[in-house]
Amino acid sequence: MTWDIKAGCMGKPERVAAAYLLSHFPDIDLDIETYLEERNRLQDEMWPTVKLLPGVKKLVQHLKKHNIPIAIATGSRRSKYILKTSHHPDVFDCFEGKVVCSDDKEYVSRGKPHPDIFLAAARELLKRDVGVPDAEPTEAHALERSRGLVIEDALTGMQAGKRAGMKVLWVPDANLLNVAYEGAEVADKTIKTLDEFVPEEWGLPPYDLEA
């Protein structure tokens, strides 16, 4: 699988991503259900061993310390989210359960790159008056949306964040930078890892000076 194909899978609901992936391999005798069953079996064995990416723990704990409202909006199903995160309680407990997953149908009907999941996280979890998808935002809604900062690694997530009217910091795998992209949405800033994150650039309290 090339990174062009992987980029088209990242951030999307699993069945949508699976259909996209398999469409590139028409000669393989594999349907979506069989593929997902085997993929999920292998992934479920690996998720509890996944390590945090550089800078994540420092940033999340910093935001929590300063009472900055934070939430997670993920394209993963809730069962997968739990598998991915339960071995890192020192980080994910900071979100206090404020998590929207792709199968939370009371909030999300469309996956990324649609803006629904980010607007739902802001509206339902952080209680921000950001309006709803597909409705023209009022001036107040637009202003409130612009105060949000989305941190994403997926191209579809970056698009969703911008379509939600929010600022977007893109932290992609280096290989994604070589993928052809013709979309209208562009991240406000791109960095290699969250170790490069400077809170003050986004109106946030600076990191404490290290002893």
Spans of features found by a protein language model:
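Asp-based, Mg2+/Mn2+-dependent phosphohydrolase catalytic module
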Residues: 61, 78-211
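Conserved phosphoryl-transfer catalytic core
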Residues: 1-8, 19-25
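A general structural signal for well-ordered alpha-helical segments in protein cores
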Residues: 14-18, 36, 56, 81, ...
